[in-house]
Amino acid sequence: MSASLARLERKLGYTFKDQDQMVLALTHRSYAGRNNERLEFLGDAILNFVAGEALFERFPQAREGQLSRLRARLVKGETLARLARGFDLGEYLRLGSGELKSGGFRRESILADALEALIGAIYLDADMQTARERVLAWLTDEFESLTLVDTNKDPKTRLQEFLQSRSCELPRYEVVDIQGEPHCRTFFVECEVVLLNNKSRGQGVSRRIAEQVAAAAALIALGVENGND
């Protein structure tokens, strides 16, 4: 095993029995051969479960929608990339030449995906309990900073954070109609989200309110909220 990978293991707090799993987790799809996308898929599922379970226990009075919002904050790409930078993960990534030249080792989405892949690799190399322990250890500071006050955000912010947690494009809002007299207008807005086949709609006495209504409708359509939270 190379000295550099041993350094990374110390930072992660886990020593791999099968070094190939670790190397694969660090291999971006731009690199020739097998890549970390399957491990990323697995790690994402484990991360969401572990975070959800921990929040369920930590906030016994929280409603479903509140728990979903807190989890979205924990697992969003920005958070994962920040953790990855703390491990200097970019130094260990295997990238294709083009991705390397364009600075892919600094890119938020690549760092976040690699961290999820490492979670999946740890699970396969050890077991669920070990993967859970690592995830909770890495997210300790994030968990400590969370309160239910964090769920009192407007729908647009909640939608943005949810999409960021899935490494998706941000929603696009468009005013499709304005009705009424200048002193009493009603704005009609559509919100386009890549995860939804249909645009969500909202209306209100201002563009801002209409966008918030459309964002709330998108959250319900995504199954993130049920309309009662």
From Swiss-Prot:
Its cofactor is Mg(2+). It holds the Pfam family dsrm. The lineage of its organism: Bacteria, Pseudomonadati, Pseudomonadota, Gammaproteobacteria, Pseudomonadales. Residues 5-127 form the RNase III domain. Belongs to the ribonuclease III family. This is Ribonuclease 3. GO terms for biological process: mRNA processing; regulation of gene expression; rRNA processing; tRNA processing. It is an enzyme of class 3 (hydrolase).
